[in-house]
Amino acid sequence: MNTISTTTRLEQLLGDQHVLKNAPASTLVEKSLLRGEGRLTDTGALTVATGAYTGRSPKDKFIVDETSVHEKIEWGQVNQAIEKETFLHLYEKVLTYLADKDELFEFRGFAGADKTYRLPLQVVNEFAWHNLFAQQLFIQPTTEELTQHTPEFTIVSAPGFKADPSVDGTRSEAFVIISFEERIVLIGGTEYAGEMKKSIFSVMNYLLPEQDVLSMHCSANVGVEGDVALFFGLSGTGKTTLSADPNRKLIGDDEHGWSERGVFNIEGGCYAKCVNLSYEKEPQIWNAIRFGSVLENVIVDEKTGLPDYNDTSLTENTRAAYSLEAIPNSVIPSVAGHPNTIIFLTADAFGVLPPISKLTPEQAMYHFLSGYTSKLAGTERGVTSPEATFSTCFGAPFLPLPAARYAEMLGEKIAQYEVQVFLVNTGWSGGPYGVGQRMKLSYTRAMVQAALQGELNTVETITDSVFGLHIPTRCPGVPDFVLQPRNTWDDKEKYDKKAQELAKQFIENFKRFTNVSEAIQKAGPSI
């Protein structure tokens, strides 16, 4: 079976079935309610439950081992190979399954706000709410663009189809399979909508570097003077929260490209964690949850329709999906100039990293390659308490190419555009997870604001004896003692022990990077 026949087979299915194509949000919401897929909250948002899968299932994600990509992909635990015949057999079974459905839902749009690099997408869904999600998260076409739209990548999502591992070559009933030659993402067995979003991110992380564009797992915003900031970090570290700043315009909250012309959003919407969400702490996100947006796995009062964002009985990984247009000060189209400031976000479960530190270019490369954070509860199946982890480039689960490819591109751009880089710890202070407290959001916001406004450029710094980080001695809006993590611990000896423990993990993890310069090697912790 070749590309033409897989495409033709899908076209036949969509031609034979009753298919709602690029339906307005109101229609998709109505369909979702009639089909029993969800219910409305008091603000008109559609709330849904995703069943057993309330987060990504990385062990069920595969890339088809095809001739054109075989030598380029970094095969391993993240990028698991699956045979072409296995994929084609499963694809045929999924289409046969979808052919029995009374109706299907199709969305056509784009990934990539910069028209030079955008990818025309087609999303075919079994569920109406999944199609609404796709409409919110990807970039919607104009009426004219839709008439001329030719998909270059297609998502086929059939959550109700459960694979049989003994027959279908999968690990479980769930699967997310990317075929770069067939230009298809095949999803089944899981209702978690984030799989659609992240699979296209993986696709763009393969395609964009081939066009000399750095793809990045980061949020981005821009100030009134046109100064651009990037926030790198894994899920739950604060990308969405910190980039939603009423004094700056939002470019995007999670996925971006950086070309010779500047940065651009890959998406057209946001997918915000909403555990413990409140209007006081995050008014922009709170107000964006309205008609047309989707709430995943949030408990809602049956009588009042009020969401309880503190209830994590289904999962810690509760989410809100909404269009960028729901953010009043978003940049549309989501393109901007070159970054002035980069902030690496980490949620340090050990509680020993400073809340903010300035990085040298060598330290920036060291920490980008290290990608240290903690896996936070709920973002992946089986994670119920934070675990220390190293995720290269702050996005290893989504990077098909070798990490060095992305790191080299970032290093070149930091040097070319003289970008200031900071490491910000949004994790624990005063002790490790379970003992200390999560860093106050108000403190983190104050530190980020000071960094973006250049207020830390002339502040005296102290060099951390273990991590070598340059810690500002003062920062507007933050008590001085908070800036030095050792000061916040009651037991200083326990702090020293924990710091050494984390430093050893950094050093052990970095041993795998054998081809980096000695200057970068020495930019990490010393024990």
Curated annotation (Swiss-Prot):
Q: Where does substrate bind?
A: 56, 192, 198, 319
User: What compartments host this protein?
Assistant: Cytoplasm
Ordered alphabetically, the record's keywords are: ATP-binding, Cytoplasm, Decarboxylase, Gluconeogenesis, Lyase, Manganese, Metal-binding, Nucleotide-binding
Q: Which CDD domains match?
A: PEPCK_ATP (cd00484)
UniProt binding sites for Mn(2+)? 198, 217, 254
Binding of ATP occurs at 198, 217, 233-241, 282, 319, 444
Output the GO biological process annotations, alphabetical, semicolon-separated: gluconeogenesis
Per the entry, the cofactor note is: Binds 1 Mn(2+) ion per subunit.
Please give the name of this protein.
Phosphoenolpyruvate carboxykinase (ATP)
Q: Which organism is it from?
A: Halalkalibacterium halodurans (strain ATCC BAA-125 / DSM 18197 / FERM 7344 / JCM 9153 / C-125)
Q: Which gene encodes it?
A: pckA
